A protein has these predicted regions:
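Conserved catalytic core of the tyrosine transesterase superfamily
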Residues: 1-244
């Protein structure tokens, strides 16, 4: 990071304020990669797209997201030209337009297509079905979904309690369809995975018994969309915007 700051101030001639803003934005990515257990040299374009989608999911304003992604593109260009990495994964990364745009949403038919693309023979089928129904039926952020606790799901009163932005709790109504799929998952494949310390009460787990990462959810939904032949740009927040 020291070399990057020197590049920005000496070669680019940027002010100390701008240099600080760039480095703070890059630290956001580095923190994200740390959470996902990804080394900088292993970063791919798809991972950067997932990071951009995570910024959106956190409710960060368009102008702020544009600044962050511009800083990241500059960072990877510096790493490439300085010989720290062989390829620039951010070369094709697009930054959001500042004009007003409407997010893609899925029709009910497309939601059914997405669910229909789940391979029922896989161990993750029940979990993935429950995830899609929960995102679509509750309008959750992906960060809320992956931290959802079993004891916060009320099957009788049809609501869940999530920790939202600013670590504030909120009560969210949940559809009976979503609850039925959560119940099927809990009584089925959820009981077949080992429970790691600290994750026993987490609803959605990976096959090793750890809580899901945001990237896992992004990749799962993207692959299902491709299998279903849905050509829209799909991510977990697409399901959130499709929530009615």
């Amino acid at each position: 990071m020291r070399e990057f700051r020197g590049y920005l101030s000496l070669q680019r001639g940027l002010s100390p304020h701008t240099v600080a803003a760039y480095t703070d934005d890059v630290k956001k990515l580095l923190d994200y990669l740390l959470d996902e257990h990804v080394q900088l040299r292993d970063v791919t374009y798809e991972m950067l797209e997932n990071f951009a989608a995570a910024l959106y999911d956190l409710g960060i304003a368009v102008a702020s997201r544009k600044r962050v992604l511009c800083g990241i593109k500059t960072f990877f260009r510096f790493l490439r030209t300085s010989g720290f990495i062989e390829h620039d994964p951010a070369r094709l990364l697009q930054t959001p337009h500042l004009g007003r745009t409407l997010p893609d949403v899925l029709s009910v038919e497309e939601i059914d297509m997405l669910i229909g693309a789940i391979d029922p023979s896989t161990a993750e089928a029940e979990r993935n079905h429950a995830i899609i129904e929960t995102l679509y039926g509750c309008g959750l952020r992906v960060s809320e979904l992956i931290n959802l606790e079993i004891t916060r799901v009320s099957f009788d009163d049809e609501y869940i309690i999530v920790n939202g932005k600013g670590n504030k709790e909120r009560m969210v109504p949940v559809s009976r369809v979503a609850l039925d799929n959560i119940a099927a998952y809990l009584h089925g494949s959820r009981g077949m995975v080992p429970e790691k310390p600290g994750a026993a009460n987490i609803l959605f787990l990976n096959r090793r018994g750890n809580r899901l990462s945001r990237q896992m959810v992004f990749i799962m939904i993207k692959r299902l969309a491709e299998a279903a032949g849905i050509r829209k740009r799909i991510s977990p927040h697409t399901l959130r915007h499709s929530f009615a």
